[in-house]
Amino acid sequence: MMMTKQKPTLTERLNIGGDEVRELKLGATFNPKNTATAFHTIKYDFKPASVDTSRMATVDVGSNNQVTVTVPNLESSGVPQTVYKGNHKKYTKECLIIFDKETGAITLEKLNHNIQVKKTRSEMTNKPSLMPATNAAPMSSGPNGVPMPSGAMAGTGSGPKLENSTMRITSKTKVSTGSRRNNIIDFKPRNSPMQQSSPSRPVASHRSPQSAPAWHANNAQQTLPSIPMIMDDDDFGLSAALHNGGGGGGGQANISGSSTGSSVGQPDYGSVNMGKQRQASSQGHAKRQQQTQRSSPPMQQQQQQQNYGRGGANNNYAQQLHQQQQQQQQQQLQQQQQQMQQRASFSHSNHSNSMPLDLDSPTHHEQAAQSMAQAAAVLEQQIGGELSASSSSSESESSDSDSGSDSDDSTEDDRSTHQQQQPPGQLSQHHHHHMQQQQHMHQLPNLGLGSISPTYNSHQHHQQQQQQHQQQQQQQSHHHHHQQQQQQSSIYASNGGFPNDLLQNDLQLSSNSSDDDD
């Protein structure tokens, strides 16, 4: 059977045994005049085992019935003391019995105040960490709203440690919270619109409206397309003018086509050679334009790159520098083109001035035709005078019929011979005139293919072309003079230097006069 331990009774604890009657005495608290003796009760919610009962505790009563109880602890516990806080209430009907073991007297006393205290929460949190109890005391004073009494801690000597430890803990918490706030503050201005629009940041300065629209509006969109567009317009205008003037007047079309590159007095074949040179120069210029377009993309592609790459301001700045470099290159190309045009015009003008006699221009044709017409008019006048004289002589000799018949026979024979001689001259004239028209017609389409774009060839190549051009001009001029001599020889007859058509008219008049006489 199990033995259960029974609690000792009050008589056993007080060692009061038997049926004895004891006297109960009233204490001094029942005396209304008593002011020195008072009894109070203290109720704890939690009492640690480390309380040192051999030392005295302190009770501090403050205002508004606030009471602070400080109980010392054992030295081995690591916590110097335990602090309780609470309030007190006055008793009205409660009493207590005091039993004296030595004398055996029993005294009844009134209770004055009931004190109910609670252990501070800082002691519970700091006890396992073996830190002094004073370290965490101010932390509990904050949420409770009750300041720590300085009088209770004055005798212990742990007051300064309490304040320093609490300040260290609070400073750590402040640093942690302060660093978080600083990070948030630093993070917000980076994404805020005020920092992006401020002029001090380089990103905002690259996005300013003073740089980008100025280059796009004035320079980039005008300089890039200006070089090919100007040259293409001039080429189309020249080719249209040459093709329109090719059917009517070949000389005027050739003059208008070659007036921009050289003087007006150049011949047709000179303009043909110039057209060939211009074709070669235009092909070279087109190749150079293709290379430049491949090396440097057009402005539209750069704008698309800018639109797709607006996230980085450094890309915009690099693109602007690239645009400036392209514009400088284009200005240099324009200056080189102007210099080449000046050189070409100067060389062509010198060439046209140095060889004015060997060239066969349309004005030279017109002057030759006018001189031939004047010479023919003078010859007609001379022949008219001689015909009048011959007609008078034929009338005087009309009496002789035999001579008239002989003259008729002779005139008929002469007429037949002159008619036989006449067609080769006329055919040669028509053939020569037809050949000149064919030359003009063949020269006009070749001129339409030319252009006045400046050549990028070397100066030596240009001199070689000029030498070949001079040799061709000399050969063609000799050929043309030879044709003129043949034409003049075919026009003038061998008898008296009169043309065949004039002699034919003379013979017809003489035959008519002889018929009238008969």
Curated annotation (Swiss-Prot):
Residues 289-342, 368-377, 418-428, 463-476, 500-518 have a biased composition (Low complexity). Residues 119-128, 163-182, 253-265, 274-284, 343-355 have a biased composition (Polar residues). The modification Phosphoserine is found at residue 192. Its main location: nucleus. One of its GO terms (molecular function) is transcription elongation factor activity. Residues 119-216, 241-518 are annotated as: Disordered. The keyword Transferase does not apply. Keywords: Activator, Developmental protein, Nucleus, Phosphoprotein, Transcription, Transcription regulation. It holds the Pfam family EAF. GO terms for biological process: cellular response to heat; positive regulation of DNA-templated transcription; transcription elongation by RNA polymerase II. It comes from the Eukaryota. The keyword Transcription applies. InterPro entries: EAF_fam, Tscrpt_elong_fac_Eaf_N. One of its GO terms (cellular component) is super elongation complex. It is found in: Nucleus. Residues 397-412 have a biased composition (Acidic residues). PANTHER family: ELL-ASSOCIATED FACTOR EAF. Belongs to the EAF family. Promotes transcriptional elongation by Su(Tpl)/ELL. Essential for development. This is Ell-associated factor Eaf. It comes from Drosophila mojavensis. The gene is Eaf.
